Amino acid sequence: MTQAPVQTDILEIAREQVLERGEGLTQDQTLAVLRLGDDRLEELLGLAHEVRMKWCGPEVEVEGIISLKTGGCPEDCHFCSQSGLFQSPVRAAWLDIPSLVEAAKQTAKTGATEFCIVAAVRGPDARLMAQVAAGVEAIRNEVDIQVACSLGMLTQEQVDQLAAMGVHRYNHNLETAKSHFPNVVTTHTWEERWDTLRMVREAGMEVCCGGILGMGETLEQRAEFAAQLAELEPDEVPLNFLNPRPGTPFGDLEVLPASEALKAVAAFRLALPRTILRFAGGREITLGDLGAKQGILGGINAVIVGNYLTTLGRPAESDLDLLGELKMPIKALNETL
């Protein structure tokens, strides 16, 4: 009896392991994908799309985000213009509840299922928690949309309070691989972020955790990050691409090449076959319109529509038109769900 040859091509391995069996790539396998030449990009994106369609389905989840408290953050995340430690043009400001509700209404009109309230803080104080509670209640009373929050690091009491408010999902990004994190943030640790995510999961809220690509990490660290996210098993992974902000320590870094960004999108899909993988900040400057289409046909199954926290995004209509062109049903508008 002739023994079947051992498969050594990483995409053939991924086809059998991920597409057929639903088992995500290991760290070493993800690294092999990230090292593929541009001549195999189309093949890679096609496989990632097949994986997404088989294990997640065709629906695309749409989300909007709003900044409840902008700027003045005491942390030194080197990519962020909201840090009070850097000479960036962003200044501290609070959003009132009526404006928050109106933003949720406008987001819901796009077909979004998720509306995320974000605050630039290390972690929420009593004033912010009270404002969030009022905002969540007002939105739930007036808008048919699920509410998520992103408020930094939490105590157990705050986690329990958010769960009691009916917060559906909590976002807290690990941002990058554990080995690279000290080069990105020095005012708190990667482990502190992990602890918040663990408490969120144990409280019954969905976990949203991703990061930013293009912050000087190596391909090895990118693969490490994907493996660490796979260990966490978040419900959603937002993938941002560094949009260098003036006045920040990363303000002079180069934008990630589009082919490298698309390879990363596909690699993360192959490492996380069943996870909601969301296009987030920086895709406009990194990928443009063509790259956005390639990403959605290369593993992405969720988008943030409209603007981000301190940068402009694509108009919501542009993303919705693109999804229509690609025949990708929007989750909130799909009557079968």
From Swiss-Prot:
Pathway: Cofactor biosynthesis; biotin biosynthesis; biotin from 7,8-diaminononanoate: step 2/2. Its cofactor is [4Fe-4S] cluster; [2Fe-2S] cluster. GO terms for molecular function: 2 iron, 2 sulfur cluster binding; 4 iron, 4 sulfur cluster binding; biotin synthase activity; iron ion binding. Catalyzes the conversion of dethiobiotin (DTB) to biotin by the insertion of a sulfur atom into dethiobiotin via a radical-based mechanism. This is Biotin synthase. Binds 1 [4Fe-4S] cluster. The cluster is coordinated with 3 cysteines and an exchangeable S-adenosyl-L-methionine. Pfam families: BATS, Radical_SAM. [4Fe-4S] cluster binds at residues 73, 77, 80. It catalyses: (4R,5S)-dethiobiotin + (sulfur carrier)-SH + 2 reduced [2Fe-2S]-[ferredoxin] + 2 S-adenosyl-L-methionine = (sulfur carrier)-H + biotin + 2 5'-deoxyadenosine + 2 L-methionine + 2 oxidized [2Fe-2S]-[ferredoxin]. [2Fe-2S] cluster binds at residues 116, 149, 208, 278. Homodimer. It comes from the Bacteria. NCBIfam families: bioB. Belongs to the radical SAM superfamily. Biotin synthase family. InterPro entries: Aldolase_TIM, BATS_dom, Biotin_synth/BioAB, Biotin_synthase, Elp3/MiaA/NifB-like_rSAM, rSAM. The keyword Metal-binding applies. Keywords: 2Fe-2S, 4Fe-4S, Biotin biosynthesis, Iron, Iron-sulfur, Metal-binding, S-adenosyl-L-methionine, Transferase. Transmembrane segments: none annotated. Residues 58-283 form the Radical SAM core domain. It comes from Nocardia farcinica (strain IFM 10152). SUPFAM superfamilies: Radical SAM enzymes. Its EC number is 2.8.1.6. SMART domains: BATS, Elp3.
